[in-house]
Swiss-Prot record:
Stated name of the protein: Thiazole synthase
Organism: Prochlorococcus marinus (strain NATL1A)
Entry's Gene Ontology BP terms: thiamine diphosphate biosynthetic process
PANTHER family: THIAZOLE SYNTHASE
Active site: 108
Compartments (UniProt record): Cytoplasm
Catalytic activity: [ThiS sulfur-carrier protein]-C-terminal-Gly-aminoethanethioate + 2-iminoacetate + 1-deoxy-D-xylulose 5-phosphate = [ThiS sulfur-carrier protein]-C-terminal Gly-Gly + 2-[(2R,5Z)-2-carboxy-4-methylthiazol-5(2H)-ylidene]ethyl phosphate + 2 H2O + H(+)
InterPro entries reported in the protein's UniProt record: Aldolase_TIM (IPR013785), Thiazole_synthase_ThiG (IPR033983), ThiG (IPR008867)
Enzyme Commission number, as recorded: 2.8.1.10
Length: 268
C-alpha cells in the first residue's frame, strides 16, 4: 500500500488522479467525453470485446478519447475463463498500440463465469494473472474482497488488486469494509476499490480507509446528470485521500468537550 505517496503508482507509471473511470453505459459519446473531463481522471478502462464488436455505445469510442492525455486500461469483461481472458488481454495490448500507447501493457483482468451476480472466479483469475505476468503484462485483477486471494495475486507479481465494494452496478456501496481493510493493511501494492460504489461519499470512504484509488462507471454514467456527478466523484476522491493523509480523530466511547473546562464561570 502506498500510504503517503503523492502519486498513484501502478507498475512503472505514476498518476496524479486516484479516480479511474469506465466507459460503458453512457447515453452518448458526448456525455461520456464531458464526464471524463470533469472527473480529471488519467486512466480510463475499455472493454476490449465490446469495442472490437462495435456494440451499442462503443462505436466511435476509441476516436472520442484523447489517448495522449488518458492512459488506456483494457479490460477482459465478458470472459468466463482464464484462457479467454488471456486471449482478450493480448488483443487489448494491440488496441492500446493502435491508440498510440506502444508501451502500454496494462490489463484489468476480469474472469467472471457468474452471469447473475457477476462475481469474479478466484481460481481462473489466479491462473490468468500468473500467465499474463509472465508475458510482461501489468495486471490489475478484479477480485472478491478476500485477503488471501489478494495476497496470492500480489506474490505472483500483480501491479494492484481491485477488490469489489459490492457487486458490479449494484450501488450497494462498500459492504465488506472489514475484509477490504485487511487487504489494505497487508498489501505492499496499491489497492483500488472496484464495483458497487454508488455515490461520491462512498468513494471518499474508500480513500479514507486507505485505498489508493477507486474505479467508477455506473454511478457516473447512469446518474441523472452524469457530467455533474463526474465532478462530484472527482472532489470526493480528493477529499477522501486528504482525509486519510490528515489522520482521523480516534473514536472515543465518551464525549469530549470542544472547549476547555478550565476557567469556566461558576454559578457561585
Amino acid at each position: 500500500m502506498q500510504k503517503t505517496n503523492k502519486f498513484l503508482k501502478i507498475g512503472t507509471k505514476e498518476f496524479k488522479s486516484r479516480l479511474l473511470v469506465g466507459t460503458g453505459k453512457y447515453s452518448s459519446l458526448e456525455v461520456m467525453q464531458k464526464s471524463l473531463i470533469n472527473t480529471k481522471c488519467e486512466i480510463v478502462t475499455v472493454a476490449v470485446r465490446r469495442v472490437q464488436g462495435l456494440e451499442h455505445g462503443h462505436k466511435g469510442l476509441m476516436e472520442s478519447i484523447d489517448w495522449k492525455r488518458i492512459w488506456m486500461l483494457p479490460n477482459t469483461a465478458g470472459c468466463s475463463n482464464a484462457e479467454e481472458a488471456i486471449r482478450i488481454a493480448k488483443l487489448g495490448r494491440e488496441l492500446a498500440k493502435l491508440a498510440g500507447q506502444e508501451n502500454n501493457n496494462f490489463v484489468k483482468l476480469e474472469v467472471i463465469p457468474d452471469k447473475k451476480y457477476l462475481l469474479p472466479d478466484p481460481i481462473g483469475t489466479l491462473k490468468a494473472a500468473e500467465q499474463l505476468v509472465k508475458e510482461g503484462f501489468t495486471v490489475l485483477p478484479y477480485i472478491n474482497s478476500d485477503p488471501l486471494i489478494a495476497k496470492q495475486l500480489e506474490e505472483i507479481g500483480c501491479a494492484t488488486v481491485m477488490p469489489l465494494g459490492s457487486p458490479i452496478g449494484s450501488a450497494q456501496g462498500i459492504r465488506n469494509a472489514a475484509n477490504i481493510a485487511m487487504i489494505i493493511a497487508e498489501s505492499r501494492i496499491p489497492i483500488i476499490i472496484d464495483a458497487g460504489i454508488g455515490v461520491p461519499s462512498e468513494a471518499a470512504q474508500a480513500l479514507e480507509m486507505g485505498a489508493d484509488g477507486v474505479l467508477i462507471n455506473s454511478a457516473i454514467a447512469l446518474a441523472e446528470n452524469p457530467i455533474l456527478m463526474a465532478q462530484a466523484f472527482s472532489k470526493a476522491t480528493e477529499a477522501g485521500r486528504d482525509g486519510y493523509l490528515s489522520g482521523r480523530l480516534k473514536e472515543n466511547p465518551l464525549a469530549s468537550p470542544s472547549s476547555p473546562l478550565e476557567g469556566v464561570i461558576s454559578n457561585n
